[in-house]
Each structure stands twice: as C-alpha cells, then as structure tokens.
Amino acid sequence: MAGRNQNRTVSLPGIQASGHVLAFGNCTDNDMLEEDAEVYELRSRGKEKVRRSASRDRLDDIVILTKDIQEGDTLNAVALQYCCTVADIKRVNNLISDQDFFALRSIKIPVKRFSSLTETLHPLKGRHILHPPPVPYFQEQDIVPADGSLSSSESAGSFLKEVDRDIEQIVKCTDTKKENLNEVVSALTAQQVRFEPDNKSIHRKDPYYGADWGIGWWTAVVIMLIVGIITPVFYLLYYEILAKVDVSHHSTVGSSHLHPGLTPPTQHREMENEIGPTKGIPVGQQDDHKLYRQDPQAHDAQHKT
C-alpha cells in the first residue's frame, strides 16, 4: 500500500512562466507517458485581452522625465503640474507611501510621448524613454533623394528665371528717368488709375441679380412717388373736371327743354330784362305776349269785357 501510495502521489498543477501552458500532474506514470504531449493553452478573452493591449500601448507612449525636488514640492503638486496621477508617479519611483517622496532628491515623472509637456518642458537631467525609438524616416530620405524633389526645384528655378527676364524687359521698355517729382507722381497715379477698373470689375454687382430686378435705389424711390402720390392726384383732378362738365351740361339741357326755340344767350338776355322768351311764338301774338308781360291785369280785364 505504501508503494502504491508513493506511485500515486498528488502533484500540484504546474504553470510555466508564460502563463498560457498548464500541465496537470494528478495522474499515474502511465497516464503521463500517454499524455505527455498534450498541453492546454488558455486564451485571453474579453477585458483581459483589451487590458493587455492597452497596457502595452500605454508603455509605448510613456516618456520618463527626471525632475529635481525643490523646497515646497509635494507629490500632489508634481502630479498636477505634469498632468499625471499620483499612482503613476509612485509606480515609476517605487514609492510605498507619500512620505517616501521626501526622501528622494529627484523624481521620475511619466509623461505621454506626444504632448505639450514634452515639447515645452526641458528636464534638468535629460529624458529617458522606456523603449528604443524607431529609426527616423528622414535619414533614408537623405540617403536616397527623390526625383520628384529635384524636378520640383528645377521647375521652380526655371520659373524664377522667367520672372526675372520679364522684369528686365519691363524695366527696359519703361522710361524710369523723370526730370522732377511731379512727373513721378503723375506716372504713379496713371498706373493706379489703370489698375482700378480691374479691381472694380471684381466687386461689381451683377445687374441681373433678380431680387431687385436690376434697378437702383433712386429708381425705386421715383416709382414709389409716381404710384403713391402723382397717380392719385391726377385721378382726383380728372374726376372733379368730369363732375363740373356734367353739371354744366345738365343745366343747359334743362333750359333748352323748357324753351326749345331760344338759344341760351338770347334766353339769358330776356330773363335779365324780365321779359319772357318770345322766340317760337307767332309774330302776331308776340306783341300781345309782351303787353301781357308788362300789364297782365289790364289784359285780363280786357278779356272779361
């Protein structure tokens, strides 16, 4: 029984340094011989995998700055000054408590690689990087220059030469020698006036804009005056004249109906002399009509007799 117990001793499971391969030893020697090649690998899932990748990226992006501790510095003040956490400073400097900070002469501060602090702050004792920096790309460019840069520089040089040639031709064509200052001023003003139409044409308003039908403000004011003031005045005057003409026409027509044989001037003259109109009455009766107008009572007495 003792030998059997010795053969079937319990061995604890062993884990390799990598943390992924597990070997289970709770079995006999025969089982170990049969299953010595079988190993099991545990894959990381979910948050653990994300945490490992995040920690790896975080270590790649961290730069260690060294700062001498001065009088009045505290752990919280340094953390606020360099925008990092107190826990990160403790982890980098292997500090157990906050009081261990005062036993140090210099402190290491973890800062992100691409930040404003790494560009503006210059540490006193240099800068330490956790991982070696990659080979810069500009060195390869210096070793093997590109053809595109050469062609661009050549084209730029040729363009500048052409510009210089044009300037020389312009200087030769124009007479820059002036006898007095007035000629210089007149020449400069002429050039300014010559270039003014180009600038004005750029800011010129489109005549076919559409919102105002291409008319100016003064045209709109004239149209409003015509529509709002002049047209109503003419309308009122026209209707007043028509009313007066209608009244005079009706008066003349009424008088002509009462005395159809008289013309208006004769009728008016007879009415002023208090003589009744005689036109249209027979000639033999005109005298009787006049006498009747003069003495109607005598005429009535004659008829009674």
From Swiss-Prot:
Cytoplasmic side, ranges: 238-305
Transmembrane segments: 217-237
Extracellular side: 1-216
Residue positions, PTM Phosphoserine: S55
Composition bias, Basic and acidic residues: 286-305
Main subcellular location of this protein, as a coarse class: membrane
SMART domains associated with the record: LysM
Domain LysM: 65-109
InterPro entries named in the record: LYSM1-4, LysM_dom, LysM_dom_sf
Keyword annotations: Cell membrane, Glycoprotein, Golgi apparatus, Membrane, Phosphoprotein, Transmembrane, Transmembrane helix
Gene3D superfamilies: LysM domain
Glycosylation sites: N7, N26, N199
Pfam families from the UniProt entry: LysM
PROSITE patterns for the chain: LYSM
GO CC annotation terms, alphabetical: Golgi apparatus; Golgi membrane; plasma membrane
Subcellular location: Cell membrane; Golgi apparatus
Disulfide bonds: none
Entry annotated with the keyword Ribonucleoprotein: no
GO terms, biological process: Golgi organization
Stretch list, region Disordered: 253-305
GO molecular function: peptidoglycan binding
Record's keyword annotation contains Transcription: no
Topology class, membrane: Single-pass membrane protein
Function in brief: Essential for Golgi structural integrity.
Protein name: LysM and putative peptidoglycan-binding domain-containing protein 3
Species of the source: Mus musculus (Mouse)
Lineage of source species: Eukaryota, Metazoa, Chordata, Craniata, Vertebrata
Name of the gene this protein is made from: Lysmd3
